[in-house]
Design a protein with these regions (language model features):
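C-terminal partner/receptor-binding element of secreted or periplasmic proteins
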Residues: 121-168
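Mixed-charge, low-complexity intrinsically disordered segments
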Residues: 48-77
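Post-signal peptide N-terminal segment of mature Sec-exported envelope proteins
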Residues: 25-46
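C-terminal motif of bacterial Sec signal peptides marking the signal peptidase cleavage site
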Residues: 13-16
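Extracytoplasmic
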Residues: 38, 81-83, 95-97, 135, ...
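Positively charged n-region of N-terminal signal peptides that target proteins for export
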Residues: 1-4
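Bacterial signal peptide processing site
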Residues: 18-21
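Mid-length scaffold segments of soluble, non-membrane domains
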Residues: 76-115
Length: 168
């Protein structure tokens, strides 16, 4: 019995490091991350009971922990919040890597990615080739992101779509 439990823990540890499917969302009721104030924060969870919080930011401030949620609902958008300064290499969506290169400000508004009919995420860029952002237009010139919130909108043409993000 102990061997089975040990094997289960070992498998859980290795699978948690991989890309996870985001199934639903809820609000935090309990967490185990030092130095964070997260109660009642909305989160997107990959497991009905627990979310492994593991950022991919390249920084000495990487945080890892477990979060329990009280309520669940069907996910409509996916938000990735990066609260420590660092470089974001890519967003992995069903094996499609997208390099982020946008100039950000602290406490910024979301940047939108749109899922096209083929299921590939595309950064929303206006007709002049700029990224509409905080009532300004920014060229894609930098990858230094002190605060990032990405919102992925599902294509309403597709009735069933799976949203997969690295970092959760």
């Amino acid at each position: 019995m102990k061997n089975i439990l040990f094997l289960f823990i070992l498998i859980s540890f290795f699978t948690s490091c991989k890309t996870r499917e985001i199934l639903s969302s809820g609000s935090i009721k309990r967490y185990q991350i030092e130095g964070e104030s997260l109660i009642n924060t909305e989160v997107f969870i990959t497991d009905p009971l627990k979310l492994r919080f593991d950022t991919l930011i390249q920084s000495s401030e990487n945080r890892r922990g477990y979060i329990d949620v009280n309520e669940q609902k069907v996910v409509e958008t996916v938000k990735v919040r990066v609260q420590s300064k660092g470089l974001v290499n890519s967003v992995d969506y069903i094996g499609k890597k997208m390099v982020l290169g946008v100039l950000f400000e602290k406490q910024s508004e979301p940047i939108y990615f749109i899922m096209n009919r083929r299921g590939v995420l595309e950064l929303y860029i206006d007709q002049s080739g700029n990224v509409p952002y905080n009532n300004h237009n920014f060229k894609m010139i930098s990858t230094e992101i002190p605060y990032l919130e990405i919102v992925i909108r599902k294509n309403k043409v597709r009735s069933v779509s799976k949203t997969v993000m690295t970092g959760y």
